[in-house]
């Protein structure tokens, strides 16, 4: 069984480099995240190939639509055998409840998580889209909504994990992007933590991309990160 907290973001434009990277990694030491660009190009066959390699897959498509449409999308994701799938919490309570019902009804139910506020956002970015609350208040509101809807957890910055756990439940999962080893570039992330810092905050899963996938030796990079935990 895989007890690793690390989810590696396979942020590649096509399957060849994604599979090359995956084949250098062990499914005992990580899970893989497939995002919008790679899935849009390669679709379900890539999910099947990665699962054949033994990996559990987080399908990171952030569904956000009317409840029936999102429920249908979650059903299809479950049929692909993914380990986790997500929605945008800002889609509202009814949408998330419909998504949860669809996930629960699946033969192999995936974990269902909700994105609170993207880690590329800060208070100014929130204000620019009409959200007057500060980051922490908005994240708490959306996390509580996801918890009320019965979801398994949220995708959030490690900065918000303690308050989310306190306002929901200790077992409510927190999946945290914006994780960078010491000395790594922050790229397009505004709220960044090292893996050790994120776990100290209470994060359950750490999403790490470029520091591993762009390394000369991805397996060595992963092992180096695991050694710091």
From Swiss-Prot:
Give the transmembrane ranges. Answer: none
Q: Provide the E.C. number(s) assigned to this enzyme.
A: 4.1.1.23
Catalytic activity reads: orotidine 5'-phosphate + H(+) = UMP + CO2
List the SMART domains: OMPdecase
Q: Which residues form the active site?
A: 62 (proton donor)
User: Which pathway is it part of?
Assistant: Pyrimidine metabolism; UMP biosynthesis via de novo pathway; UMP from orotate: step 2/2
Q: Which InterPro entries match?
A: Aldolase_TIM, OMPdecase, OMPdecase_AS, OMPdecase_bac, OMPdeCOase_dom, RibuloseP-bd_barrel
Q: What SUPFAM superfamilies does its record include?
A: Ribulose-phoshate binding barrel
| Single GO cellular component term | cytosol
One GO biological process this protein is involved in is:
'de novo' UMP biosynthetic process
One Gene Ontology molecular-function label? orotidine-5'-phosphate decarboxylase activity
Residues bound to substrate are: 11, 33, 60-69, 119, 180, 189, 209-210
Q: Which domain of life is it from?
A: Bacteria
What's in the keyword line of the UniProt record? Decarboxylase, Lyase, Pyrimidine biosynthesis
**Enzyme type, top EC level:** lyase
PROSITE patterns (UniProt xref): OMPDECASE
The family this protein is said to belong to: Belongs to the OMP decarboxylase family. Type 1 subfamily.
What this chain does, per the record? Answer: Catalyzes the decarboxylation of orotidine 5'-monophosphate (OMP) to uridine 5'-monophosphate (UMP).
Self-association or partners: how does it assemble? Homodimer.
> Which named protein is this?
Orotidine 5'-phosphate decarboxylase
């Amino acid at each position: 069984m895989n007890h690793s907290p690390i989810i590696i973001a396979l942020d590649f434009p096509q399957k060849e480099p994604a599979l090359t990277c995956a084949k250098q990694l062990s499914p005992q030491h990580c899970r893989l995240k497939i995002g919008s660009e790679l899935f849009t190009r390669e679709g379900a066959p890539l999910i099947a190939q990665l699962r054949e390699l033994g990996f559990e897959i987080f399908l990171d498509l952030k569904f956000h639509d009317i409840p029936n449409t999102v429920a249908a999308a979650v059903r299809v994701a479950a049929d692909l055998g993914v380990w986790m799938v997500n929605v945008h919490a800002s889609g509202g309570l009814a949408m998330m409840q419909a998504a949860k019902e669809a996930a629960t009804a699946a033969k192999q139910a995936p974990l269902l998580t909700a994105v609170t506020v993207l880690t590329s956002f800060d208070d100014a970015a929130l204000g620019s889209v009409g959200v007057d609350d500060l980051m922490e208040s908005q994240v708490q509101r959306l996390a509580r909504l996801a918890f009320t809807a019965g979801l398994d957890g949220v995708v959030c910055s490690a900065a918000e994990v303690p308050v989310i756990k306190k306002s929901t439940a200790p077992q409510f999962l927190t999946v945290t992007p914006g994780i960078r080893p010491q000395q790594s570039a922050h790229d397009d992330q505004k709220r960044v933590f090292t893996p050790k810092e994120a776990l100290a905050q209470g994060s359950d899963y750490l999403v790490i991309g470029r520091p591993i996938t762009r390394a000369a030796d991805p397996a060595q990079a992963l092992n180096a990160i695991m050694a710091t935990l």
